[in-house]
Amino acid sequence: MGAMWMKSMLLVLLLCMLMVTPMTGARSDNSGPWMWCDPEMGHKVSPLTRCRALVKLECVGNRVPEDVLRDCCQEVANISNEWCRCGDLGSMLRSVYAALGVGGGPEEVFPGCQKDVMKLLVAGVPALCNVPIPNEAAGTRGVCYWSASTDT
């Protein structure tokens, strides 16, 4: 009876290991400090209303009033988890595109403002505001990681 019990336990342990290994492998790609930026994990995405105003003014070449810059920088600094700052800025950019009906092409967001220019301006807000972000684009300081992607 002892040998049969040992074989059964060994088989159960082996099955458990086979089940757990793929689950932990899949989770490891998505785990890290950035996982707390997911709204499903309780993160409240900041609307960054003053940053919207700043980027719109900058994109068409208008001077940005000091209070708009200060307020935008404060909004970004108020995102307590540094890992979430670029995610919230990306979310803001996508919502601006959606509100203006901008598609996936290289068109203007609004007269005088090209989509790729707006994207780079938004990605550079942390550098402009001198707020730290741990997930910078390769070879840059203060520029969000998604600035070089074609998705945003």
Curated annotation (Swiss-Prot):
Which Pfam families does the record match to this protein?
A: Tryp_alpha_amyl (PF00234)
Fill in the PTM field for this protein: Five disulfide bonds, which are essential for the inhibitor activity, are probably present.
Tissue expression: Endosperm.
Tell me the domain of life: Eukaryota
For whether the record's keyword set contains Metal-binding, the answer is: no
Task: Tell me which UniProt keywords the record has, alphabetically.
Answer: Alpha-amylase inhibitor, Disulfide bond, Secreted, Signal
- Give the signal peptide range: 1-30
Q: Which InterPro entries match?
A: Allergen/amylase_inhib_rice (IPR002411), Allergen/soft/tryp_amyl_inhib (IPR006106), Allergen/tryp_amyl_inhib_CS (IPR006105), Bifun_inhib/LTP/seed_sf (IPR036312), Bifunc_inhib/LTP/seed_store (IPR016140)
The name on file for this protein is Alpha-amylase inhibitor BDAI-1
- State the organism of origin: Hordeum vulgare
Supply the gene name.
IAD1
